[in-house]
Structure formats: structure tokens, C-alpha cells
Amino acid sequence: MADENGSLREAGAGGKTRAQAVVTIPSSAYFLKQVEEEEEVEALKVEVAAASDTESDTSSDDLSCGKADIDPSLLERVDEEKCRSIRKQYRQLIYTVQQNRDDIVNTASDSLTEALEEANVLFDAVSRTREAALDSQFLVLASDLGKEKAKHLNSDMNFFNQVAFCDFLFIFVGLNWMEDDERDPLNNCDDNIALSFWETVQKEATSCISQAETFHFLFGSFKPESAARKPRRNHRRKVQKMEENGVMPTKLRKLDLSGNQEATEKEVERILGLLQTYFRKYPDTPVSYFEFVIDPNSFSRTVENIFYVSFIIRDGFARIRLDQDRLPILEPININLAGEGNDPSFHSRKQGVISLSLQDWKNIVAAFEISEAMITNSY
């Protein structure tokens, strides 16, 4: 043992020599090896701390000088040792929970809760993937145990003893079948006993349950007597009867267009009479076309007047020409011309209807200041 300790001390001088000395340790002394590794890590920590103190004493002005001279490999070994310790604790926790699996599931202890709290404490120091994987493995194990523990819960909420309920119900209504063992309740229960049983149960049940008011509908007629049903019309029978009697539906009569034509001719003659009256009253003054046909109070009546005046022009009772202001005027033919032979336009007369919109009608009424229609209504 002394030789082995001497070889370990020599290993502290160099990295290669230390590695060779560790290999020569036999497998039976594994625990001693682990203890010596922990002592070596502690010695490294002391060495790092001493180096830091020395640098801070020599150069107190430069605060970051001590940290800059620390070997990164030493810090790496310290972190590796910390992570190794966390993994060891996780494995020990998983092993303990697996060994106590039956006690955790079948008893009402808080072992699973305590194990979860311990895992939460370990997880605060986890910084690498290997330790996080062990934490996930423990959580999977804990969730399985929690599921099994929930299945073993004994809940009496859904338990219902029908036999005991029937016995209590019989005693409540005054029928105790258990007093006479020789009596068969199914064979000796007559209709009167059954009726009395249900009446008692109904009376006690209604006293505990508030009864809702009856609902009445107010739809339909308020008359006391019922409405008489209308007889259904048999359309098919009526059609057959009409075919048997030879009755045919009334045909549409042809539209009588002659009546409309006569009404148009009468209106044209009436307007022509008004125009000739004006010509006789003012023989030398032609009448303005717009002042004659425009009705300031009715646009539809104005359109009708234009339509009727076109027939007067077509039949040669008057003509339209433009005055010096380029506005249309109406003149009688028999005043300016002696006969039809002297009228160069007699054989080339044409009928035309001007277009007039509602806005044009308003503008003409405002421009000519027409306040009263020259063609009065006949109705």
C-alpha cells in the first residue's frame, strides 16, 4: 500500500505519469480509487484558489488578472465532477423509486411526492443534456407510478346495494318481510299490498319534490265551440263534370283598337280647333311651338300634346318652321299660301316626333316662363 501511495504522489508531478499510475490500480481497490480522485479534485480546487489569491496580492490594481491566468482545463474538470455527481444522484433516485414501487402504489404514503421534490432540487443544477435525459427518465417512471396509484384508488361513490335499498324501502312503508322467514314475499304479495306500497311511496316522494305548475296553451280560437271544418274542394271532379257537359272556358276577345283610334282622332280634332281659334284671333302672329304644347303642370300631358300635334302637321293643317331666333313656331297653311299647289312642301310633308326629357321640360318651362297651358284638358 505504501508503494501505491508513493506512485500516486509521483503522478502529481506530470500528466502522463499520473495516468499510468491510475491504470496500475487493481479492480478490487475501486472504492479507494474513487476516494483518491475526490481528494485530487479538492487539491485542484485549493490550487486554483491559491493561484487566484497570489495573483490578487501581486497586482491589486488589475482585478481581472487572476481569472485570466486560471487554466480552463481545470475549470472543465471541476464542472465535469459536478455533473458526474448529479448523474449519480439521479441514478440513485431512480433505483430507489424502482425498488419501492409496490410500496408507492399500494400504500397511502407520500414517497412519490418526496421523490418528485428531490428531483426538482436536482434539476435546478442541470446544465447538460445527459443530466436532462436522466431527469426525463425519472419523470416517465413517476408518471407511470402515478397512473397505477390512481387506478388503485377505492371510490365508493358508484357503489349501490340494491338489496339493502329494497329492505330499507319495505321497512319505511311498513312492510317488513324479514320478520317471517317462511313467508315468500313474491307469492303472497297481492294487488292491495302493492297498491298500498306505491301510494305510500308516491305520497312521501311528492312531499320532498316541488311540483311544477301545469302549462296551458292559449293558441287557437277563444270561442267555446270548435271551428267548423271547411269542405275540401274536389277540383278533379269539377273538371270531369265540365268535360261531360261540354263547357269550355271563355276565350279572350280580340282587342278593340277602333275605339282607341276614334279617341285619338277626337283629341286631334279638339287640339286643331284650339289652334285654328288662335289663328283666327291673331291671324298675323304665329304661335310658339313650345308655348302651345307645353303643360307646365304635367310632363305626361306635354308628351301627349306633342304626339297629337304631330298628326296636325302630317295632315297639312299647320306647319313648323324656325323663326329669326331659331326657335320652332306653328303657322296655318291657309294664311300664307293660297292653295296646296303653291305649297312647295305639300308633296314632301313628313311626320316627326321630337324627344323630350323631364329635365328638358323643366328647362323650357323656366326659360319661356310658361305658367298656363294653351291646350286645356278635356277631362
Swiss-Prot record:
Cellular component per GO, a single term: nucleus
Family note: Belongs to the NSE4 family.
Quaternary structure note: Component of the SMC5-SMC6 complex which consists at least of SMC5, SMC6, NSMCE2, NSMCE1, NSMCE4A or EID3 and NSMCE3. NSMCE1, NSMCE4A or EID3 and NSMCE3 probably form a subcomplex that bridges the head domains of the SMC5:SMC6 heterodimer. Homodimer, and heterodimer with EID2. Interacts with the C-terminal region of CREBBP.
Subcellular location, principal: nucleus
Name of the protein in question: EP300-interacting inhibitor of differentiation 3
Recorded coiled-coil stretches: 32-58
PANTHER family per record: EP300-INTERACTING INHIBITOR OF DIFFERENTIATION 3, NON-STRUCTURAL MAINTENANCE OF CHROMOSOMES ELEMENT 4
Keyword check for DNA damage: yes
Function per UniProt: Tissue-specific component of the SMC5-SMC6 complex, a complex involved in repair of DNA double-strand breaks by homologous recombination. The complex may promote sister chromatid homologous recombination by recruiting the SMC1-SMC3 cohesin complex to double-strand breaks. The complex is required for telomere maintenance via recombination and mediates sumoylation of shelterin complex (telosome) components. Acts as a repressor of nuclear receptor-dependent transcription possibly by interfering with CREBBP-dependent coactivation. May function as a coinhibitor of other CREBBP/EP300-dependent transcription factors.
Tagged with keyword Repressor: yes
Any one biological process term the GO annotation gives: DNA repair
Keyword list, A-Z: Chromosome, Coiled coil, Cytoplasm, DNA damage, DNA recombination, DNA repair, Nucleus, Repressor, Telomere, Transcription, Transcription regulation
Cellular location(s): Nucleus; Cytoplasm; Chromosome, Telomere
